[in-house]
Amino acid sequence: QLPETIEKSEFKTIADLGKERLRRVIKEIKVLIQAQKEKEAATIFGDSDKYKLDLGFKVFKLSKSNFKIWDSTLEKEPEVIQAKLFEHIQHISPEAEQEAILYELLLKSGFELTTPIEKLTLAGLTVFSIAEGQLLICLEKELTHDCIKAMAEMQPTRVICLDEGFKGENADALKTNAVQIMKSKGVVNFRTV
């Protein structure tokens, strides 16, 4: 929702009005659930698990990318190109939060914001499973062979890892092995950002 202003209202924008309406509905649902739980608690066969609902919502705002964008209009001078290359070694904004990077990659991969995301722990590292394992995203800054192997064994269609996750003196070997491990398990698209 664009931040369209509202005249003659206690809310500044339509988005603010929508958020308040959602909050009120959630509050009403919680009251109804509590009343039903109390009613069922009086019976022997009360089942409170059926009332476990996700009653939250997220608000997304359009903002600049978390990734630096390459300027293709650069002069052809080798010194200028070299300077720009060094600037892009660290191409993720230092202020970027993990959740913001995750959702940006989700959108850039063609998924909707409502796509189910599951947080997994593979070989001690956090990996996000998108759309029931179609896409795995690992935003860890120190990848391990075991984590790469565990992701590949899940046989997703696509895997995205941070380029900076491949660190140390064996970084190139780990990245090369990651590509081969993914291919051997049928992962169609493995890339780093």
Task: Show which residues each predicted segment covers.
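Accessory, often C-terminal, charged low-complexity segments
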Residues: Q1-V193
